[in-house]
């Protein structure tokens, strides 16, 4: 039997100082506590900053490239009381590569991080969210899903596949009151521009708070 879900508990997978931190801050303003999953070196830098802003932050070190270990980490989180009612998958492997030069190993690793990690998160979270009567599963996508960039071959493939995966997940959980969607950022994220992380975070909040009759499987951010 899944443990009870806390609707004011956000799980951010792939925590970083840009969009991820913006989402944590936006949800934090609404009283959410956050659990951040990332590699330890990222958490060591980000978590103290967010706590210094008065946000309630827990951290869990995990490497999505180790899918078995990553799944076990998620199972521990969702097997404890107060499991997250909102999951945001924000992980990606953005290193440049060219499709005709990259290796099979590189393509597989990127696919694990860009796509499979989101699917695993949904697989683990869905039973708890179903038992709770609802929840939210969001994933960060990008304009590369629409317009592949030759110098970012693996990432372009991954973002397109992620959108397809989230659409399938959405179809599988909608009747359970769970909203699954991608948030597609159609531009370069940079503070102080139209693509400021805090502006983008507002769209994540909209996706989470939309009424069921307004649910979309993709929310697009094209600039403030």
Each model region followed by its residue ranges:
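Conserved glycine-rich cofactor-binding loop
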Residues: 16-17
